[in-house]
């Protein structure tokens, strides 16, 4: 797995633009982890919200921006705690927030990992799966 992660990092680092790097990241993580969904939410500290910047497996509505406030949802909780959250059934968690536009209602398993560089939260990476399971 470490070899695969290094390969992903190298591909992401060689992408010429951020959106291409993020699309490589979510696609390759889905394949490496054998999961249906991987998404990246980037933090905007001025507006105190996360923007869904890239996803594989969720619906990203055209012409609409998907945002979560820093205090919303499990993504917000991952950011506030600055540590991973691994849930077999995210929908039962008190911080779960349903976002109808991304069509995530069938996904139960959730792993959210903060993206941190030099002690600054840059965003949250999320993987999801329909089956009830905890990621290992």
Indicate where each model-derived feature is located.
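Regulatory loop-to-helix N-cap segments in sensory/regulatory domains
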Residues: 62, 128-136
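Signal-transmission linkers at sensory-effector interfaces
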Residues: 1-20, 31, 122
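Short loop/turn motifs at secondary-structure junctions and domain boundaries
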Residues: 101-107
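Helix-loop-beta substructure at the N-terminus of cytosolic sensory domains
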Residues: 14-53, 62, 72
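Regulatory sensory and allosteric helical modules in signal-transduction proteins
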Residues: 51-53, 60-98
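A short, aliphatic-rich beta-strand micro-motif
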Residues: 108-116
């Amino acid at each position: 797995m470490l070899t695969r992660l290094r390969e992903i990092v190298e591909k992401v680092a060689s992408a010429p633009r951020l959106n291409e790097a993020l699309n490589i990241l979510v696609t390759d993580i889905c394949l490496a982890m054998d999961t249906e969904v991987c998404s990246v939410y980037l933090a905007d500290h001025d507006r105190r919200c996360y923007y869904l910047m890239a996803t594989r497996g969720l619906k990203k509505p055209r012409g609409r921006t998907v945002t979560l406030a820093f205090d919303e949802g499990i993504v917000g909780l991952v950011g506030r705690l600055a540590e991973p959250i691994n849930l077999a059934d995210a929908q039962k968690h008190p911080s779960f927030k349903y976002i109808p536009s991304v069509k995530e209602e069938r996904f139960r398993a959730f792993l959210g990992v903060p993206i941190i560089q030099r002690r600054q939260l840059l965003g949250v990476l999320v993987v999801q799966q329909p089956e009830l399971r905890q990621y290992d």
